């Protein structure tokens, strides 16, 4: 039987949530009460997602998941909501090359269900059906972010 204990003395990687919090929340219903009337078609909803991470110490990081949703009927805003939902994470024992994926994939993945519920509640409380945001592929978002940063670095490295 294989021994699952780490025998080389190195600590096994750990990821813990120390705190979760709403950093910023806003909901705008500029056309109320007219915007609450029945409509022929559903509004167009655009959702933007962003993740930021900042170190608090060698092992503790503040990760903020930002969700911005805007519903429009033609050129008129039906509702607009913004949420910055944060978590303080303790990240220890990971190799350095795994730190960014942990912070930008795993941490927001843990925050997302809570942020999604807040958005659903605030849109429902604003008089609309709850906005249930589809699951987000944070791995793909991170890969896209890395590719954009690499492309930017190549452009900046080209002499004029």
Curated annotation (Swiss-Prot):
Pfam families named among the record's database cross-references: SecB
Protein transport listed as a keyword: yes
Single Gene Ontology BP annotation: protein tetramerization
UniProt keywords, alphabetically: Chaperone, Cytoplasm, Protein transport, Translocation, Transport
Keyword Disulfide bond: no
A GO term from the CC aspect: cytoplasm
Subcellular localization: Cytoplasm
GO molecular function: unfolded protein binding
SUPFAM superfamilies linked: SecB-like
Protein family per UniProt: Belongs to the SecB family.
Main function: One of the proteins required for the normal export of preproteins out of the cell cytoplasm. It is a molecular chaperone that binds to a subset of precursor proteins, maintaining them in a translocation-competent state. It also specifically binds to its receptor SecA.
UniProt-listed PANTHER family: PROTEIN-EXPORT PROTEIN SECB, PTHR36918
Stored NCBIfam families: PRK05751.1-3, secB
HAMAP family: SecB
Record's subunit section: Homotetramer, a dimer of dimers. One homotetramer interacts with 1 SecA dimer.
Protein name: Protein-export protein SecB
